[in-house]
Amino acid sequence: MPNGSDEKISVAPIIAAIEAPYLSDLSERDKPWDKHRKNTDKVSAHYRGSEFNVLADRTSFCSEFLDFRLTPGDEGELRLKLSTARFCRVRHCPVCQWRRSLMWKAKAYKVLPQIVEKYPKHRWLFVTLTVKNCPIAELRATLTWMNESFKRLTKLKDWPAQGWLKSVEVTRGKDGSAHPHFHCLLLVPPSYFSHGYLSQAKWVELWQRCLRVDYQPVMDVQAVKKGAQPMSLVPELLKYCVKESDLVADREWFLELTRQLHKTRAIGTGGVLKQYLKELEEEPEDLIGQEETGEPDEGHLYFGWRKREKKYKLVDY
């Protein structure tokens, strides 16, 4: 799974240093590094001069230097794999958010086949639960209310899932409001589609009842085809809590977001899936990716962040 980069490179390090001084020139797959690090500079600038000045310092030094190992590919070509980097681990750092998502996805891809093997006849639902937009200053209270409502939902007699994975996403409204919503992967028994099926209208009714509101909330319910694997849903489930364009769009909105989401959880698990996926609820210790044991090391390439150029450039070490 994601472990630096698997992009194949058919050039020797010396030639690469002369003809392709930037990471993005060497590895197509590693181009996202430039985008995420550029946005990290913007986030750092947002934090500067606020009560989060310490976060400004931490993000400004995040992933300034990347050490990639050169490893042989199947056909003798060289591949880049991230070996060493220092991350700030600030929750809303775009680089760390990206790396965290990669690690979460890697764990999910590893564990989900075990669940499918354990429950081969069960089916999967992908459910999105929403509420009306709220002022950004009321985001924490809104999420608390949504989590309490979700807990009520799971205790209803009609609740069909035997296990679930829930992630939080917050998007920025055009008027500066916040739109929090849940993405949920539900494991349901085979009988769900024969005599326990819930229509879209019924789902809306149940969610409205648990929210205790006088409007019909917007929902989306999709069933994974019979025999299909749930892995295709992982990217949507475990992508990010707040997309980068929203993080950098407005400084005051972003600072309030930081206050509102402080010490809140982005991922929750329950039912029979908790024992398999509980690790996703915690901050991953490893943001690089475990190395494959016994893999040959053909040398290293080092890249430093160049703020003016907004690119990672090959450097001597």
PLM segments and residue spans:
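Cys/His-rich zinc-coordinating modules
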Residues: 184
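Right-hand nucleic-acid polymerase module
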Residues: 1-178, 188-317
